Amino acid sequence: TEQYGDDTNNKLTKRISEQIESKGVIEVLRKGVKDRGNTFKLVYFKPKSGLNQEHQDLYKKNRFIELRQLKYSKKNENSIDMGIFINGIPVMMLELKNSLTGQDHTHGIKQWKFDRDSKEPLFKFKRNIVYFSVGNEKVFMSTRLSGPKTRFLPFNKGIDNPVNPKGHMTHYLWDELLQKDSVLDLIENFVHIRKDVEKVYDPKQQRLVEKKSETLIFPRYHQLNVIGKIKQDILDKGTGVNYLIQHTTGSGKSLSIGWLSHMLSSLYQNPTDSNRIFDTIIVVTDRRVLDKQIRGTILQLEQTKGVVNPVEGTSQQLREFLESGKSIIITTIQKFPVISETISKLGDRKFGVIIDEVHSSQSGETSKHLKKSLSKSNLDDYQEGENEDDLTQVDKMILDEINSRGKQPHISYFGFSGTPKNKTLELFGTPSEEGFKPFDLYSMKQS
């Protein structure tokens, strides 16, 4: 008020609007707004631990508002069925359709495509994090309105949603997603802007030019669901449990791995704990060159510099990362055989190891070293196979030794595979009366 006087509210509101216009609502809510040397935080996310009482108090003061029949234009009297606001800032828009009136989610999609002008200030790209079309039976979503070209994706529990004895099939949207903590969690840890650069041919310049694009990423239901399930299972059971995530092509696996790595790296058993459950999260790809998509996703989700550490150099760099306790390390499985000795010295720490395409990664001598390096006492030494023909024997020896030794209490494995083999199921799967099964399944039909 000293700088703006009586016009403080108007000036600050204008500044916030300008920042959302240029940077998008996600960045503004995460980082706040700077004006004349001051930073204004517009939301307080749920604290990871309960050690900071002031943060706890501020978090409880967040205001959530659901507005029905939200008018959005100066040009007409059109209205959105529902808008969700955090501290006065719009974040989600919903069209709600009832089968009793002969409508379903497809009618809402048509409204978004043909009746909602994407040039309206409220509908500009990055102004909201998601646009939902909600029927009694299905939910669809989009993150960017662009007229008839608007792309909607399903936000359903499966191909069809299961019957809900307590209400509509889509009531999970309200019970699970549209809750205060869930919305805050989405904004803080999931939604993000993916920046892509591709080379395209420009006929005017007669050469290849770089074309930049942005995509607002909002998680699908199966992605939010598996992260939440794993989180709760770890809180219930602790470390030393293996998880097989059977998500097929088209499931957004790189995103799921990225979200999982960040969730695990900031997970506390109790709000009052000062130490995280996992000391280090290691993301392992089965490629000699780091998977650019997985690496890029994890880096783009990074909000604090230095949390994510891709191993780009020698094994010495990986050794240093592990010894210094880096939060998230990204490497290839080929790096593990040369550092078995180094990792064995860190046996009192707790590790979460996320492995991409485990059905192939766990075959061969690299698997032996990986298991050997992340155990308190090394697996018994044995002669390594020197060529492809020896791998089957090595596989059997690995499985025999792992099974005889049992689970390692300080290490949890999270294996992603679209087509797991029986050995993969036995090693990573969840025991059941019918044998081993994946902890979570997203099938080809669903994708």
What spans do the regions from the language model cover?
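ATP-dependent helicase/translocase motor core
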Residues: 1-280, 289-305, 334, 343, ...
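Extracellular/periplasmic catalytic domains that process cell-envelope and extracellular macromolecules
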Residues: 86, 322-325, 406-409
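Signature of the SF2 helicase/ATPase Hel1-core->accessory helical subdomain module
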Residues: 101-105, 143-144, 151-153, 337-447
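Structural recognition of the conserved hydrophobic beta-strand(s) that form the central parallel beta-sheet
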Residues: 132-133, 329-332, 411-417
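Cofactor-binding loop segments of dinucleotide-utilizing enzymes, especially the Rossmann-like FAD-
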Residues: 134-136, 285-287, 416-418
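Hydrophobic positions in the central parallel beta-sheet of the AAA+
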Residues: 283, 329-331, 353
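Conserved helicase motor
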Residues: 285-288, 309-317, 333-338
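Conserved motor-coupling elements within RecA-like helicase/translocase cores
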Residues: 314-329, 345
